[in-house]
Amino acid sequence: MNGINTANEEITRSLEESLNICKQSSRLMQRNLQTGRLMDAFRNCSISLVEMRNSALTPKQYYELYMFNMESLRLLGGTLLETHLNGTHNLMDLYELVQYAGSIVPRLYLMITVGSAYLETPNALVREIMNDLLDMCRGVQHPLRGLFLRHYLLTQTRKGLPLGSEDEEDASRKGTVLDSVKFLVINFTEMNKLWVRIQHLGPIKEFSKRTQERNELKVLVGLNLVRLSQLNLDIDTYRDHVLPAIIEQIIECRDSLAQEYLVEVICQAFSDNMHLQTLDTYFGTVIKLSPSVNVTQLVVAMLNRLTDYVQREYESDSSNEDESETVTEKLGDIKINEEVQQKDEQECPGDKVIPPEYAIQEVLWSHVVEVIQSRSGLPLDCIVSILSSILNFFLRCYPYKPQYADRVFQYINEHIINQPSLRSALHERPLQKSLCAILLLPLTYFPSFSYCLELQNFLPVFNAQDPNLRYDIARMIVQKIIEKGHSLSELTEAQELLGFVSVIIEKKGVDSLDDLQNVALMVHYLNNDDPQIQIEILRSLKDTFIKAGENVKYLLPVVVNRCIFLARNFRIFKCMDWAEKVRLLWEFVNTCINVLYKNGDSLELCLALYLSAAEMADQENYPDFAYEFFTQAFSIYEESVLDSELQYQQLLMIIGKLQKTRNFSVDDYDTLITKCTLYASKLLKKPDQCCGIYLASHLWWQVASGEDSRPFQDPKRVLECLQKSLKIADACMDQLTSLKLFINILERYFYYYDQHCESIIAKHISGLIDLTEQNMRSILISSPADLIASDPRAYASSIWEVANVSVIDSLKNHLERATAYAEKRSEDERWSSIFQ
């Protein structure tokens, strides 16, 4: 350890000494440049550059020394160019002069400084100087010194590289873009060789350290390729001259670090259009790389780049079209053609951006498969990563052509899932997550889930996953269907969808309730305009949902409700055997509700569903089915509803549904409402009995509607209900409860009197008003301690919740409002007789 510290201290000391010499020489050089003593400035700069021969420095320390000298050389080069332009000195003479420097490293740095300045002057012998500099730089073969020397050559000549063509005047002297290509390619080749040789410097035990140092220096080599990409080359030059030369050097160097980095630079530096026309060369190169190269990264990088290119160009074209349409609309003097063809909603971005003659789908897929097959030892996770990238390309660039994406799933199914040697690896968590991510891609990028169902190999890959991952994927499927709002209309689509979501349905316990609710919501997106197909879809849903066990109560109700409203469609789309189909539909509804009833924990739900079915059956004029559903609801009420509070609430629901019916025969309707009134009279609590009976009176007095000219009305039974409710109200021991019920019954009398119910006469109302007012006076003189409301539910909550108003005051106000209503109608002779 002490030896290592001593060596590091010596290297640091050597760097400090070199920097001190460079700083002193730089100050002297600047002073001589200011006084015009150019030869002395060269001498000072040369002394500073001699330190670039220091072999004791690490690459990082050498870079520090290099950057300091670059600043001095930049100042020198700027001054030289200025003196040449003002005629003080001639750069060509200076170029020959600096070649007499004693040491090769300072000599070449000075030659590059003077030569690069000369390249920027008019009438410069560009081609000659470029070739000379390239040849002279071969004189430094030390890997580190040569690498930085050529990097300096690259940076200094950037502005002076020719960009013209052979057709231009003085092309032989000024050079052409091909000369620039040759210059950069040769410099790249030599720099790469030097970079690769760095690994052989020093002892073998420091190989990993040198590899790390090489990794830090790779940008110096890659800059050559970046400069090539900035020459604005045409595709022919790139394909015929640039790329082959670069690829040749990459393959010949046989260094995995260099190969991987440089191929990645090619992918990132050159334009997308160039890549599109040289994919064969790119992927052919990937196959020829050393076995230790991570080809996955190189393939994925190219696929991702092409995907982003297609998306970017497509969005740009769409934006330009929208702007063009906006401008056209704003030009009022230009008549807009109303028959402009609308954009095809199913236009694939790839079809619009990439010319069809490129056959990009076939080319990419064949190359991907070839790369995977050429690397027999490629890890499984790397294969999945490549497949994920090509799938991402197909989905984002060709979302309306699922046949391309299906190739990926077919490959996974045949070469991964069905391979006996890989079965153990399939259960590894990282691979499971990677396959899960692949399965989620179609859900993200396909316009609707129906396109996923066209993937014949999607379900086999899905079924091969771990149950927990299948559950997560199924949950995502349901969420995407709901989010995108696209309906699935075919029976086969619905059945295939259920094959995916069955993992949610069959999961036991309460942990999946939110997901089950989403499954129920998903049912609304399974629609077919043909009611016969729709009922088959609902049957498939029922057959799958019953596998949910005790959780079936969260799923089947939506099927029942969809069936109930489907009955209306059968009326609209009547076919030859529509009556038989309606019968089967109602039988199916009854079967579904029976499944819920047998579940034992859905009694209220079953009763509500029977009532909804009965209501729809009556509306659609199917009285026999409506009667059957009401009787089923009555059976549940009689046999299973035991809680008194629940009985009261359920009875109110039954009364409400029955009151809306209009298509029963008189006998059937009379049977149902008589039974309902009987239920009201058997409620446990007196106030409930009273309320139930006076509400049931409405069943005996239906109001005529537009289509119902002869509603069911039985004045005698109305009066009987009201009188019986009065008797029960009078029997209530609590005075406040009794009074409240009396007021409510009085309002019912007013209602039926207004409806011209023959059994309700003014004498009855007058007597009830007197009796109610008498009870009110009796309460007002009673002791407050005696007024204990035993059943607050008998009072309207809106009354009792009024702040700072006592119960008695509320009842008094209620009675006054009721009687005031009748008094306002006293102009009518019928109403005035009430108060006589």
UniProtKB/Swiss-Prot annotation:
UniProt GO BP: intracellular protein transport; retrograde transport, endosome to Golgi
Lineage summary: Eukaryota, Fungi, Dikarya, Ascomycota, Taphrinomycotina
Top-level taxon in the UniProt lineage: Eukaryota
Subcellular location, record wording: Membrane
GO cellular component: cytosol; endosome; late endosome; retromer complex; retromer, cargo-selective complex
Protein name: Vacuolar protein sorting-associated protein 35
Pfam families recorded: Vps35
InterPro entries associated with the record: Vps35 (IPR005378), Vps35_C (IPR042491)
Record function comment: Plays a role in vesicular protein sorting. Required for the endosome-to-Golgi retrieval of the vacuolar protein sorting receptor vps10. Required to form proper forespore membranes.
Disruption phenotype: Leads to sensitivity to thiabendazole and microtubule depolymerizing drugs.
Keyword field: Membrane, Phosphoprotein, Protein transport, Transport
